Amino acid sequence: MELKTCTLVLSHFWFDQIVAGFKTVEYRRRCHKWQKQIIEKKPQKVVFSKGYSAVKIECMIEKIDIGPCPYIGWEGDFIRIHFTKLSKDESKAIYQPEL
């Protein structure tokens, strides 16, 4: 059985933070679009794309909840996607840094 997947496009900065192991929660504004794609769909896996390039990583979703975001200037509650941290082998195999 194939896992339900959510695909999210990230800026290069946030993508690199995931690969480096610093980021394990993705925040999305509470709106109809994300409510439908994340809360209602209940994905088990998230695919992050580095911008609109072919560079992608897959992570298993540990939980999805609603709560505050720790970033300055991001007020209110957000949809929070908690995902597994990539192992060193996974980040080396999937991610090829730009030269």
Describe each region flagged by the PLM:
Residues E2-T5, V9-L99:
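Structured alpha/beta reader/binder surfaces that contact nucleic acids or chromatin modification marks
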